[in-house]
Amino acid sequence: MRTHYCGELRKEHIGETVTFYGWVDRRRDHGGVVFLDLRDRSGIVQIVSDPQRTPDSYEQANALRNEYVVEITGRVTQRPEESLNTRIPTGEVEIYADKIKLLNAVGKQLPFQVSVADTETVREDLRLKYRYLDLRRERMAQNLQLRHQIVKAMRRYLEDLEGFIEVETPILTRSTPEGARDYVLPSRVNPGEWYALPQSPQLFKQLLMVSGLDRYYQIARCFRDEDLRADRQPEFTQLDMEMSFMSQEEIIELNESLVCHIFKTVKGIELQRPFLRLTYAEGMERYGSDKPDTRYGLELVDVSDIVKDSGFKVFRDTVTNGGIVKILPIPNGNDVISNVRIKPGGDLFKEASEAGAKGLAYIRVRDDGEIDTIGAIKDNLSEEQKQEILRRTGAKAGHLLLFGAGEAATVNKTLDRLRQAIAREFNLIDPDKINLLWITDFPMFEWNADEKRLEALHHPFTAPHPDDLSDLKTARAQAYDLVLNGVEVGGGSLRIYQREIQQQVFEAIGLSPEEAQSKFGFLLEAFEYGTPPHGGIAYGLDRLVMLLAGEESIRDVIAFPKTQQARCLLTDAPSSVDAKQLKELHVASTYKPKS
């Protein structure tokens, strides 16, 4: 029977006889004495098998190899001074093995080394194919334990301190337009009809508020059939919350307290409150982003009014046609960023063009503090315009000023990407710094140029600002996003709870009354039976864990993730199914594999 986990043993256990289980992380033979590093999820402890002191275990220890599974019983002893290991928590003790029992051996060559001591970089496809081995590695085991600690902290705070109730909502539901494609499943017992996997529990949690539950939360599984990247998966996990009778301010305050509790409990970090707040307009104006990383400066400066009457046609025409001209000021940029990098073929030009920009204009500030204009800008800015640009940007000797000109969305996207790239190159990002901020006052709608219609910026159940009800199409939403170091980790809003306003929003996004009734009739009817004011928020758990773990991809904080092609390399899903299954579901595939 196990008495301890490997990583638990300390000086206070010296003299005790202990039993534990684990995997052989490493085996070493020093002058006839066998040393084993035994590993389990808690860490590593050193085992000693000396033929003089523990002859009964020596033969077994000598036969062990990496990743063999064993049971060991022995005595905890003090390590000699010269072999103390301060790098691990158990480094002051070692176990003299009295009994070693082999539980299972390794029958094949390992596809990669699992040992803590091994520093090789393993290809991600191998790690995903043999995920059960990858999860034995110290880093991955720690990531999953961190994830567990975060979820536990969330649950304890919400239940014990705020009175929330955890409720599960359906996984099999109906398809509703929420922004991304749904994953759909055919119904065998209802031929020709389909379920959808939920993109979020949005409508059900609102219905729980109609039910009078008052405060709900759920660790919810969500599914979206969208293009993937490092911080997206087809299935993901949210901390989902909904509250009745609370203002936006009260919801924000509660969630700041929740986040502070998580950081304090899990990382021992005291966060400063209140968190910074920016409106959507301020975020776009200063950073070109609604999720800015504020750990560094490099704020954008709008100079549209300065250059609107300049001799530079590109700037003049841009402003005349309703566009903007903004500058990304880069201190000491002259010394590092060459003209070649900004012109076609250069890395910064490529970064800008991928964001939709057609080109980059720039000026340099000489060592004497004067502007050194080049190319098409030369002689097309008056001295007064040059001096006003210097004043507004605060540019000094050595500054490089990168211009973006065009539609506001393209300019902001371009300069946001360049801002991030420059910050990385100039090492302006402090990895230990934690900057949290709220973005508020989002627009209710954005224009979908492909479909020639308005669509909800968040979702169509977000409540408009009460001051903007006279013109919903230009209204601000009562929405709020929480941003951590440039990554959106949470987003929520006050909800519409009156049928008339909900119908107006459906109409604004192009849903006819008949379509609205067909898709959301159950919600509209619920609003007839005394719906309370309510609002909520959802946190991307995978992203939050990724950031707290210091990882670059959410795949490294999910036990069994998919690739960027939405495949599981471990189980080879998705896969084909046999004709009998398809027949039972009344489904036929029209896909023809390429020859």
Curated annotation (Swiss-Prot):
Residues 202-205 are annotated as: Aspartate. ATP binds at residues 224-226, 233, 488, 540-543. It is found in: Cytoplasm. This is Aspartate--tRNA(Asp/Asn) ligase. Its main location: cytoplasm. The record marks 30 as: Important for tRNA non-discrimination. L-aspartate binds at residues 178, 224, 458, 495. Keywords: Aminoacyl-tRNA synthetase, ATP-binding, Cytoplasm, Ligase, Nucleotide-binding, Protein biosynthesis. One of its GO terms (molecular function) is nucleic acid binding. GO terms for cellular component: cytoplasm. Aspartyl-tRNA synthetase with relaxed tRNA specificity since it is able to aspartylate not only its cognate tRNA(Asp) but also tRNA(Asn). Reaction proceeds in two steps: L-aspartate is first activated by ATP to form Asp-AMP and then transferred to the acceptor end of tRNA(Asp/Asn). Its EC number is 6.1.1.23. Belongs to the class-II aminoacyl-tRNA synthetase family. Type 1 subfamily. PANTHER family: ASPARTATE--TRNA LIGASE, MITOCHONDRIAL, ASPARTYL/LYSYL-TRNA SYNTHETASE. Homodimer. It catalyses: tRNA(Asx) + L-aspartate + ATP = L-aspartyl-tRNA(Asx) + AMP + diphosphate. One of its GO terms (biological process) is aspartyl-tRNA aminoacylation.
